[in-house]
């Protein structure tokens, strides 16, 4: 595992706005309501074979929680939460069950990775889904302006190779945006202001973690 200390929190994407930096330049940011989360389980190398911390986020009516989940929350001594996620860490001994996790953990962090589920676009063609150029607008083109074009060879190999980029379902995928600059941490309102766009719809669940590629504290 990397030497970087990985910290993570669950949150909800609220939308985008803009702020001004120290040089009065406009910076587009995504506002994420991150936490407060609560630790529901701590995994150690001795008992589980790896180090991780399980955190829970979001309110939910206890009547809507199934019995296995309700028992898990009861064992941890916390009220039921809507979302649960596990964050791999280098050393989980600094966490304990019932502990609150807030945006304060990112006070000294400059870059983060954000994981979310992208907007679903439904069935999309090659131009929208993969950025294909399409075909000529005139010069003999007839009803093929947005078609994909050739998808392979002839009798040899006599098939379409796996992974060929074609039309199909687009979006609704779990993706991670890496090395996004953390513009501001608002501890009072439990908000993270992240430069640029992050995956998903407004109100969607996101996981914000310390950037793994070495630039987190740059």
Curated annotation (Swiss-Prot):
Belongs to the universal ribosomal protein uL3 family. Gene3D superfamilies: 3.30.160.810, Translation factors (2.40.30.10). The keyword Lipid metabolism does not apply. Keywords: Ribonucleoprotein, Ribosomal protein, RNA-binding, rRNA-binding. Part of the 50S ribosomal subunit. Forms a cluster with proteins L14 and L19. The lineage of its organism: Bacteria, Bacillati, Actinomycetota, Actinomycetes, Mycobacteriales. Pfam families: Ribosomal_L3. This is Large ribosomal subunit protein uL3. One of its GO terms (biological process) is translation. The keyword Lipid metabolism does not apply. InterPro entries: Ribosomal_uL3, Ribosomal_uL3_bac/org-type, Ribosomal_uL3_CS, Transl_B-barrel_sf. The gene is rplC. One of the primary rRNA binding proteins, it binds directly near the 3'-end of the 23S rRNA, where it nucleates assembly of the 50S subunit. GO terms for molecular function: rRNA binding; structural constituent of ribosome.
């Amino acid at each position: 595992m990397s030497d970087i200390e990985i910290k993570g929190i669950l949150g909800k994407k609220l939308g985008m706005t803009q702020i001004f930096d120290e040089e009065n330049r406009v910076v587009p940011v995504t506002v994420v309501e991150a936490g407060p989360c609560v630790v529901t389980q701590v995994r150690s190398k001795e008992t589980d074979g790896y180090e991780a911390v399980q955190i829970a986020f979001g309110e939910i009516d206890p009547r809507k929680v199934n019995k296995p989940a309700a028992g898990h929350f009861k064992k941890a001594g916390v009220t039921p939460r809507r979302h649960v996620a596990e964050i791999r860490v280098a050393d989980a001994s600094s966490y304990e069950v019932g502990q609150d996790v807030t945006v304060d953990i990112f006070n000294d962090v400059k870059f983060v990775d954000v994981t979310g589920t992208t907007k679903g676009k439904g069935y999309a063609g090659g131009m929208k889904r993969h950025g294909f150029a399409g075909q000529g607008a005139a010069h003999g083109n007839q009803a093929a302006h947005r078609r994909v074009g050739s998808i392979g060879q002839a009798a040899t190999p006599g098939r379409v190779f796996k992974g060929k980029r074609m039309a199909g379902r687009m979006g609704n995928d779990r993706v991670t945006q890496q090395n996004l600059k953390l513009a501001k941490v608002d501890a009072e309102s439990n908000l993270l202001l992240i430069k640029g766009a992050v995956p998903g719809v407004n109100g969607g669940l996101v996981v914000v973690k310390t950037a793994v590629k070495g630039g987190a504290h740059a």
